[in-house]
């Protein structure tokens, strides 16, 4: 050996990723696990960003459709304060109350129809006070508009039943179908909304 030369050392080993064991074999399972962990992070910058953008676009479209649905529902439910936009929760509550009021009206109408069909005199069928959306006052409901005065659908005898479709309020009702007359009676029932 030369006195001034140092023995040559082995070439430096490739750097080992942080967090991996100090094994230097490239085929070691530990090194493979570390390299697999790094790959998805680099893949997200390319294909992952597009997937995130598509997901965000789908969510924006979903929210847009939900908002359009609420906008359409607001147009169909009655609300007292027309000057302010109902919140989503208020819209849903108003829709529930509106549906319940319609169900009560249909139940009352069916009871009157059944009583008239059976030849029985309808008993004073009065629905419970209709509850409208918050802030509105209930309106008295009576789709049959029973009265003792003679009219197109009634008789001159006091207390005799009248047709649920008759009304003395309008002179053009004779040209309307029964469904249209029922809607007119219903709209007068909702007059306060």
Swiss-Prot record:
Region of interest: Disordered: 1-27, 37-56, 118-177
Pfam families for this protein: HLH
Record localization: Nucleus
Coiled-coil intervals, chain numbering: none
A GO CC term assigned to this protein in UniProt: cytoplasm
Keyword terms of this UniProt record: Developmental protein, Differentiation, DNA-binding, Neurogenesis, Nucleus
Name of the protein in question: Achaete-scute homolog 2
Gene expressing this chain: ASCL2
């Amino acid at each position: 050996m030369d006195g001034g030369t140092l023995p040559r050392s082995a070439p430096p080993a490739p750097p080992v990723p942080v967090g991996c064991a100090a094994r230097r074999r490239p085929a070691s399972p530990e090194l493979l696990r570390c390299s697999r962990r790094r790959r998805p992070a680099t893949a997200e910058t390319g294909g992952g960003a597009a997937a995130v953008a598509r997901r965000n676009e789908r969510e924006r479209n979903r929210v847009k459709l939900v908002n359009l649905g609420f906008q359409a529902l607001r147009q169909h439910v009655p609300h007292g304060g027309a000057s302010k936009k109902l919140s989503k929760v208020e819209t849903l509550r108003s829709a529930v109350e509106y549906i319940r009021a319609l169900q009560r009206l249909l139940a009352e109408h069916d009871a009157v129809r059944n009583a008239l069909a059976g030849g029985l005199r309808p008993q004073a069928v009065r629905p419970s006070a209709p509850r409208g959306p918050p802030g509105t006052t209930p309106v008295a409901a009576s789709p049959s508009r029973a009265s003792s005065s003679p009219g197109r659908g009634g008789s001159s005898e006091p207390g005799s039943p009248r047709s649920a479709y008759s009304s003395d309020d309008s002179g053009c009702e004779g040209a309307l179908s029964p469904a249209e007359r029922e809607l007119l009676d219903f709209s007068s029932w909702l007059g306060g909304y």
